[in-house]
Amino acid sequence: MSMLRLQKRLASSVLRCGKKKVWLDPNETNEIANANSRQAIRKLVKDGLIIKKPVTVHSRARCRKNTLARRKGRHMGIGKRKGTANARMPEKLCWMRRMRILRRLLRRYRESKKIDRHMYHSLYLRAKGNVFKNKRILMEHIHKLKADRARKKLLSDQAEARRSKTREARKRREERLQAKKEEIIKNLSKEEEGKK
């Protein structure tokens, strides 16, 4: 059997693949050996004496199965971990995600007029200061603030109503006293005139 190194090289160039992927018909070695040009190789490819082998299967089925298992938390124990906790899930990334969630919520609340810009600013700074661990806690805090504000407003309104009521009562009482005084003075002046 003659060496078909040249033919293999030319075939790989013609077929645009590696030399490993070229199949030369072992029964037709003499005919293949005579082909020493690209044109001749193309003819042999057309005749089916030289074939480009198919791509070998590299299945991802096992990989997919393992990935699904890992999502459930399998194969992720202490013994499987190589990097530090910070390398596996950076603290900065967690912080960025949390800040983006909290700031998005605050922005949405401000746009929908659920909170005013002053409350927005104070809560924004508090979020930056690591006061709120997650979105739920921030929402609860906002509801609590709003409830407190509403309660204070109600109490102040009630106090104002009470003050205005007492003011009115005092005014009426003063008017009554004034009227009584005037009446007494009138009576006294009449009596004095009667005596004269």
Curated annotation (Swiss-Prot):
NCBIfam families: PRK08570.1. One of its GO terms (biological process) is translation. InterPro entries: 60S_ribosomal_eL19_sf, Ribosomal_eL19, Ribosomal_eL19_CS, Ribosomal_eL19_dom, Ribosomal_eL19_dom1, Ribosomal_eL19_euk. Component of the large ribosomal subunit. GO terms for molecular function: RNA binding; structural constituent of ribosome. This is Large ribosomal subunit protein eL19. The gene is rpl19. Keywords: Cytoplasm, Ribonucleoprotein, Ribosomal protein.
